[in-house]
Each structure stands twice: as structure tokens, then as C-alpha cells.
Regions:
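Transmembrane signal-anchor/signal-peptide helices with a preference for the extracytoplasmic
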Residues: 1-17
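Intrinsically disordered, low-complexity polar regions and short flexible loop motifs
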Residues: 19-228
Length: 228
């Protein structure tokens, strides 16, 4: 009887050791995933910090009341807002359009969806959007994360770093890139987007995106249906 109990104890010890090793292995895999993800997020912040735009503006002297031109430089996240709402845009090669627009927002309100590419500003953010797509894709395709909910948790970390004007640019940019658009709709990446920042005639309606792009609960329902 004693020998039988000893064998049973040994068997239980082996089971416990195996479970502990599996737990340690799972923890190491998750830590490796997170380390890579946070490296990617740090690079994303570096790309934002590297954004720079120089423009000229008129300033009136307090003493002489005369106007003079000065050059100013904006950097980082400020560039997103400036390009969207303030950058002067005109189309000298278009004989039917002599208007100077104030930001991409006005171009979108004039030309609709086609105005995004017509403005010729989006290439400034090419590296930014390509890397953001890599981050979302890395999470979505991760074998270390089990199911939509686990992946959504990390997508939430990414989304939490997006400013209001980054979300606006993401909304318009992704209309032209189906793969990015699909990830946005899958994980409600635009749930914090404020519709009042969108150009006129654009909204959170299904004409542009599936409801899941803005509604995490709906995105969860769709994901669970797919996982069944």
C-alpha cells in the first residue's frame, strides 16, 4: 500500500511539474510577443515624432503695424491637425478650380472621397500608416493570442495611443486600403472617433464602414459568431 501511495505521489509531482513547465512556457511566449509589440509601438511613436512641416505665415509687427513673412515649423502630432484643417491647398493644373482650400477637410467636402488623393498630402504619412498596419496585422495574426477577445485587448492598447486627428486620418486613408479597413472593422479601431471632426457628408454610417468599425460590442458579436 505504501509503495502504491509513493507511486501516486510521484505521478502527481510529475503532473504538477509538467503543468508548471507549460505555464512557464506560455508566459515566456506571451512575454516575447509583448516585447515585440512594444518595440513596434515605440517605433510608431518615433515615426510620429519625426513628422515635420514648414510653412510661411504673415505676422503684423506691434510697433510698425507692417506685415512680414515668417517661417514656422510644426512637428509630431500637430502635423495631423494642420494638414487636415489649415494647410493651404490649390490645384494649379486644374483650369476649372482656382480656389485655395484650407486643409484636406475642405478638399474632401468639395470632391468627396476622391479629394483625399487629389490633395496630394497623404504621402506625408505613408511610413506612419504602413507601420500602423504592421502593428495591427501582427496582433491579428499572432499565434500566441487565443481568440478575438485576447487580440482585442492588445488592439485597445494601440487604439489608446491614437489622437483624435490620427483617427480622422485613419478613417479616410483606410477607405483606399481594404486590408487595413478589414482590421479596423474587425476590432472597432475607430470606436473613439468623434464624428464632428469628419468632413461634411462623411459619417459613421455603413456607406463607408461596417458598424463594427465603431462599435466594440457589435464587433465582439460578429467575432464570436465566426469562432463558433
Amino acid at each position: 500500500i505504501l509503495q502504491k501511495e509513493e507511486l501516486e505521489d510521484q505521478r502527481q509531482v510529475m503532473i504538477d511539474q509538467r503543468e508548471e513547465m507549460e505555464q512557464q512556457n506560455s508566459t515566456m511566449i506571451r512575454q516575447r510577443f509583448e516585447a515585440t509589440l512594444f518595440q513596434m509601438l515605440n517605433l510608431q511613436q518615433e515615426l510620429i515624432g519625426a513628422l515635420k512641416h514648414q510653412y510661411s505665415t504673415s505676422v503684423k509687427s506691434a510697433a510698425s503695424k507692417e506685415k512680414r513673412h515668417v517661417d514656422r515649423i510644426i512637428t509630431g502630432r500637430e502635423v495631423f491637425q494642420y494638414m487636415y484643417e489649415k494647410k493651404k491647398i490649390d490645384f494649379p493644373d486644374d483650369p476649372e478650380d482656382h480656389y485655395t482650400y484650407k486643409g484636406v477637410k475642405e478638399v474632401l467636402e468639395k470632391y468627396g472621397e476622391a479629394g483625399y488623393e487629389k490633395s496630394d498630402i497623404p504621402p506625408i504619412f505613408d511610413h506612419y500608416f504602413r507601420h500602423l498596419y504592421r502593428i495591427l496585422k501582427y496582433i491579428d495574426q499572432s499565434q500566441e493570442l487565443d481568440g478575438w477577445a485576447a487580440k482585442y485587448k492588445y488592439i485597445g492598447i494601440v487604439r489608446g495611443q491614437l489622437s483624435r486627428y490620427e483617427l480622422v486620418w485613419l478613417y479616410f486613408n483606410s477607405l483606399f486600403y481594404p486590408k487595413m479597413k478589414g482590421l479596423i472593422e474587425k476590432y472597432a479601431v475607430l470606436k473613439n472617433l468623434r464624428p464632428e471632426y469628419l468632413a461634411q457628408d462623411f459619417d459613421l454610417g455603413k456607406k463607408w464602414y461596417a458598424k463594427t468599425a465603431f462599435d466594440a460590442d457589435r464587433a465582439r458579436e460578429v467575432a464570436l459568431q465566426r469562432e463558433e
